[in-house]
């Protein structure tokens, strides 16, 4: 089974909207930043480095501001094992996430806020059973399928120091980078 996502590249380069509330947002790191290749340590709820609820809220606002579906703490230069994913007003914070089981695989084009305008076909499981902690430290389980499974796995890769470009086949990566370069040139983006 093959799924395809398309995205409006003109929308992606528009200036982000202003957050609705006074929740602080974070700056995204660039694709070359070394934090993207580091394994993130577990978030310690016994001795939290930050307020988990406030931190998750800021991740959500940053994700919305940048028109994303998912955002990990390390994409904002924080070494915490947490990410958020969702759309509209429905986002879920995943602290210390892990996959319990997964299904057969599917192909889909993915993008990443840390790699603007780069769409790559990536193979991932279509369905995943997962465990994580919410912002109160309570253990949760969920089953994600389709784009939600893909988003969870993409963000979990960030937690494990894996960027999606390393999951692409070499020729697909080369073609994607070439297409991205042409698009950035046509949009006059450096």
Question: Where are the model-predicted features located?
Answer:
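Positively charged
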Residues: 1-190
């Amino acid at each position: 089974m093959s799924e395809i996502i398309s995205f409006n590249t003109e929308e992606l380069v528009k200036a982000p909207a202003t957050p609705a509330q006074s929740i602080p947002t974070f700056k995204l790191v660039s694709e070359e930043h070394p934090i993207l290749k580091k394994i993130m340590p577990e978030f310690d709820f016994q001795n939290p480095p930050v307020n988990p609820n406030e931190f998750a809220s800021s991740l959500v606002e940053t994700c919305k501001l940048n028109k994303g579906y998912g955002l990990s703490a390390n994409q904002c230069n924080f070494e915490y094992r947490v990410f958020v994913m969702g759309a509209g007003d429905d986002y879920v914070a995943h602290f210390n996430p892990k996959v319990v089981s997964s299904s057969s695989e599917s192909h889909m084009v993915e993008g990443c806020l840390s790699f603007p305008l780069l769409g790559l076909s990536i193979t991932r499981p279509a369905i995943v059973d997962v465990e994580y902690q919410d912002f109160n430290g309570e253990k949760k389980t969920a089953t994600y399928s389709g784009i939600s499974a893909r988003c969870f796995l993409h963000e979990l890769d960030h937690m494990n120091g894996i960027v999606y470009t390393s999951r692409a086949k070499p020729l697909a990566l080369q073609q994607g980078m070439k297409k991205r370069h042409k698009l950035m040139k046509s949009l006059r983006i450096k």
